[in-house]
A protein has these predicted regions:
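Conserved N-terminal diphosphate/IPP-binding helix and adjacent helical/loop segment
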Residues: 1-85, 90, 94-95, 99-129, ...
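A short glycine-threonine-serine/GTX helix/turn-capping micro-motif
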Residues: 132-138, 196-206
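Acidic, Mg2+-coordinating active-site segments of isoprenoid diphosphate-utilizing enzymes
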Residues: 67-69, 94-124, 148, 177-195, ...
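Short hairpin/turn module used for nucleic-acid contact or packing/dimerization
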Residues: 303-355
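Residue-level signal for inorganic ion chemistry
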Residues: 61, 147, 180, 276, ...
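A glycine/threonine-rich phosphate-anchoring loop and its flanking beta-alpha core
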Residues: 123, 127-156
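Alpha-helical scaffolds flanking conserved acidic
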Residues: 72-88, 133, 163-169, 228-239, ...
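Transmembrane helix-loop-helix
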Residues: 151-168, 291
Length: 355
């Protein structure tokens, strides 16, 4: 792949349209819930604020699928569908932060920590941590409900078969991300990790959810045929795993000022990632025991990072990413020129990023 390019003006306009679509949707929701009082209104505003910003990669893949199938510019129905996928992403992130007990997200307090702090600041009675955790569960559910509502409305505005197909893919995506997240939870209960097991988590938690389904949903909404959806899938599964491997690297070696999360957070949380699995394959018995003992501890982050670096796992993962990029590039070559034009720069954004 060529060097990464800046986001195009058309893409920037599209990303701004996503924010506007979410704002419109939330504003339309509020009048029905304002009678419930300021607490609920504040909860809704906090949910909307949580999905502001971010990489918007999933929305961009919806756009790429749409453009690859239709060649049309950012139609409102596509923008609303992409916004729905971003709301789904918001739901997953709120719950993910809660399960990982993460303190921050994008440089701000995670939802459960935010509302834990609000509980204390307001002088409420009861357990502040319980309040924060409970609110995070509910906010994730709320964002999922909003996502469902928005995509069903968008699908009703296109040809019936196309709309039904897009919603079916969306429903499958929700089940796949739940399955991938559960596999991730199970992995953290095991004393060891294999690269194959970690790759399975990467495929379901990231490749399908981040790249494959958004691409296919956008293409299906525009009336794309089976051949196009299959071609997009071939691109996505290579590209999506590369995206997750880059995430693994950033979770250990990323700059907190850029990622918005503390350095080594994946190690602190005991994540059984492909990077960790690769390191365990490469080190000797004593280093292996040391790395496994360090995972999931605050004090062991620096030692675990040093062991991973010394093992050669970082170089091995970078080589894996390069191989996956090449395979994705070859799959893009098999698409028509219209699809190639929108996918190539987006593929670079997914794998050559610092956050």
């Amino acid at each position: 792949m060529a060097d990464i390019d800046d986001t195009t003006s058309a893409e920037t306009t599209f990303l701004h349209a996503i924010d506007q679509a979410i704002d419109r949707f939330v504003s339309a929701q509020l009048p029905s819930f304002e009678p419930l009082g300021d607490d609920v209104v504040g909860f809704f505003h906090a949910a909307a604020a949580f999905v502001t910003g971010g990489k918007r990669l999933r929305a961009s893949f919806v756009r790429a699928g749409w453009l690859g199938a239709s060649g049309e510019s950012a139609a409102p129905v596509m923008v609303d569908t992409a916004a729905a996928i971003e709301l789904l992403q918001g739901s997953a992130l709120v719950h993910d932060d809660l399960m990982d007990d993460s303190d921050t997200r994008r440089g701000r307090p995670s939802v459960h920590r935010d509302f834990e702090g609000r509980h204390r600041d307001a002088g409420r009675v009861g357990d502040a941590e319980w309040f924060g955790r409970s609110t995070a569960v509910l906010m994730g559910d709320l964002l999922l409900s909003w996502s469902n509502e928005l995509i069903v409305d968008a699908a009703a505005r296109v040809e019936t078969t196309a709309g039904r197909r897009a919603v079916t893919l969306y429903d499958r995506c929700k089940s796949e991300v739940a399955a991938g997240q559960f596999l991730d939870v199970v992995a953290q209960t095991r004393p060891d990790v294999s690269v194959d097991d970690a790759m399975l988590v990467a495929r379901y938690k990231s490749a399908k959810y981040t790249v494959e389904r958004p691409l296919q949903i956008g293409a299906a909404l525009a009336g794309g045929d089976d051949a196009l959806l299959d071609g997009l899938s071939a691109v996505a599964l290579h590209l999506g795993v590369a995206f997750q491997l880059r995430d693994d690297v950033l979770g250990v070696f990323g700059d907190p000022e850029i990622t918005g999360k503390p350095a080594g957070d994946d190690l602190r949380e005991g994540k059984r990632t492909v990077l960790v699995g690769r390191a365990l394959e490469l080190v000797g018995p004593s280093e292996r025991s040391g790395l496994l003992a360090a995972l999931g501890t605050d004090d062991g982050v620096a030692a675990a990072r040093d062991l991973i670096r010394a093992s050669g796992a970082l170089e091995a993962i970078e080589a894996d990413i390069a191989d996956l990029e090449a395979e994705a590039d070859a799959a893009i070559d098999r698409l028509d020129q219209q699809a190639q034009a929108v996918l190539r720069p987006l593929a670079l954004r997914a794998t050559r990023r610092a956050r």
